[in-house]
Amino acid sequence: MNILDALDAQSKRTDLPDFRAGDTVKVHARVVEGNRSRVQIFQGVVIRRQGDGLRETFLVRKISFGVGVERTYPINSPAIDRIEVVTRGDVRRAKLYYLRELRGKKAKIKEKREKQPS
C-alpha cells in the first residue's frame, strides 16, 4: 500500500450506516452561520452513490413545497454529523434519475421487507 492509500484509510469514516440507492435517509449536517453552528436535517431518497474511497458522494432528493430539491454530500465530510436510514427501498437500479420526472404515487419507492429468520 502506498502513502496516499494509507492517508485515505486514516481519513475514512467508519461510523456511518450501510445505505444504497432507493433508501430514505436523514442527513444531519452541521451548518455554520456567522459565529455559531447548528445541525440541519435533510430527509429524502438516495438517488445515487458515486465514487470510491474519500471521494465517494451520494445524492439525496426530496420534494419541498412542491419543488424537487437535490443535495450532494461527500460521504466522508466532517460537516455530516450523522446519517440515519429511515426506510430501505426495493429498487433494481443503482442510479434513480428517472424519479425526477415522476409525480405523486408513481414516484413512491416500494419498501424492502426484511426476511424473517425461520
UniProtKB/Swiss-Prot annotation:
InterPro entries: Ribosomal_bL19, Ribosomal_bL19_CS, Ribosomal_bL19_sf, Translation_prot_SH3-like_sf. GO terms for biological process: translation. One of its GO terms (molecular function) is structural constituent of ribosome. Belongs to the bacterial ribosomal protein bL19 family. Keywords: Ribonucleoprotein, Ribosomal protein. NCBIfam families: rplS_bact (TIGR01024). This is Large ribosomal subunit protein bL19. The gene is rplS. This protein is located at the 30S-50S ribosomal subunit interface and may play a role in the structure and function of the aminoacyl-tRNA binding site. One of its GO terms (cellular component) is cytosolic large ribosomal subunit. Pfam families: Ribosomal_L19 (PF01245).
